[in-house]
């Protein structure tokens, strides 16, 4: 078994694709980790904005969470319809491009790509940050831990969709079991205590502030905007419909409903218990900081084994939340590449039937972010949710146009559902933009514009290439004369002999060029007449010319390139074939033992850009 087989698994045939498809159980960790993990930081993000209100701020977490839950429900029903209408994968890019046009589609694609890169970097950083706060000795190794987790997630995803689902299933279900258990036990205690439960471990008291009778609309809008980070990753299932086994649409819809249902239960339960237990957020930048979930689990269950298992599962899930981006980003890139807005290589599936290039590129870009910020990406959090809500809005608006065009039974009802989704997410997008603009949302806008410009440039290049190589006339064989053949060699041997034999089958006009070096030139000239000219003449052929090129500065490639350019000018009506003899080693570690002149020569000739030059490799395989 090769090293690659051990690292990535044995290659899968296209016929194995059905076996790699997944059901709901595997779909939850693959496509739902990002959304579900947001229960660990979404409510806290909203509560952090309410810290200045003291105890009064805790009262507002329930209505703020209720607004987010209503929005989640609307988006859920909207995306169920998108999955049914686009069973081949109906992400925001596909829907917006098909129904609103090319540019809105690119906006949706760029917004989602940037959001996915942020999800990976910030998710891993948040998980490692929580681990470091629990084990301070690990603080110097923050960046190494981040990059290590990133590498593991990348490798698991390169092994295939099904295997990724199996690997991430256990930590996902442990996270859900412990957090749902906390919500259930806490709710029962609250109900039996008539809404005033006694905490096992009392949370720190809220910030003492002057009497506040009500929160300003601006503070509540900011809290809502921060809490909307809980909705990132909701779209992933609609992009990955083809990953599900038959019945594809039903399995994808069921998975989406389970993910959204679980997230709603978690958000509602956390908000309810936070208010019941009087838990306020603490300032992350000050000593004594505790996460909201840490205080909540302590209040409900104390600081025993259950607390540590729950907090441990949260740390793991925060780190692994990046997996949703690894499942969706490559599929999005493939869809964009199919329309020539990204390199076509993004559309090719690798040895394990996954889009390898998309996975690797996402890991590299996220790794760069982690390197730049030293593994601490708190400053990137304000950029969150902008891309997601922009994509949500364009997708839902596209579905409205879709139902308007398709019509038929149920079209009006579907149009109303998607229209409501478009309005709700559009309003939320404006709120998030206004609330977060000063703290970094403008950076997202610039990045989206830059990425769209890059994609348009790629499309322009492909259009130019397509226009240049396209042909409508049939094959013409008129005026096809024998080419001028040039064979560069450095000494006489089996490699040179094989190249020369092939050259003589193409044309009688063969020139062998040799760059002068004192020892090799003398030896070659002595052998040329006996080893080449005499045998060719005896066979009735025209002996090839041996042309020795001077090189006073000991350059090898430049004299050959100059000679080729000169031959091109002297033979304006002829094709020129350059036969490049090359040694091919059996093992990769032998290549550094040889010079790489053949490869460099080919590169230089190709860069020369003459359309009449044809390069031909004649390999000699080393058997030893």
What are these language model-derived features?
Residues 1-45, 77, 88, 96-97, ...:
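Membrane-interface "cap" regions at the ends of multi-pass membrane proteins
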Residues 1-14, 464-473, 478-624:
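Cytosolic C-terminal regulatory domains/tails of membrane transporters and channels
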Residues 28, 345-356, 392-437, 468, ...:
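C-terminal membrane-solvent junction of multi-pass transporters and transport-like membrane proteins
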Residues 47-88, 92-97, 103-108, 122-149, ...:
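Extracellular loop-to-transmembrane helix junctions
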Residues 153, 158-192, 255-259, 381-393, ...:
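Membrane-interface loop-to-helix entry segments
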